[in-house]
């Protein structure tokens, strides 16, 4: 148990994970994910903010975990957005095909 506790205390700041999470959250926002996956986008932002607070508190293990979760939530938001856009485009194509272009 002592080794595990000392391993946590010497964990380095999760600089790479924080940068990746921030980039993923920003990219999701710019791409329009909040309109299609608001819950996932908000969760990603909230976890990133919590990770930043954990870094300030020097709880690097928690910060790394939250940053990784934030990145995954942002990626999920983007995937949901892409799925919704693809579905909408397919519906529009079917609609256009069924009218036979008689507009």
Enumerate the predicted regions with their spans:
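Long, charged/polar, soluble alpha-helical segments
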Residues: 4-103
């Amino acid at each position: 148990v002592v080794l595990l506790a000392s391993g946590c205390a010497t964990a380095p700041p999760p600089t790479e994970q924080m940068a990746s999470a921030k980039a993923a959250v920003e990219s999701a926002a710019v791409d329009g994910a909040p309109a299609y996956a608001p819950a996932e986008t908000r969760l990603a932002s909230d976890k990133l903010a919590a990770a930043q607070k954990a870094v300030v508190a020097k709880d690097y293990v928690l910060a790394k975990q939250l940053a990784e979760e934030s990145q995954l939530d942002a990626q999920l938001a983007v995937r949901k957005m892409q799925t919704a856009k693809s579905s909408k485009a397919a519906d529009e194509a079917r609609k256009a095909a069924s009218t036979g272009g008689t507009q």
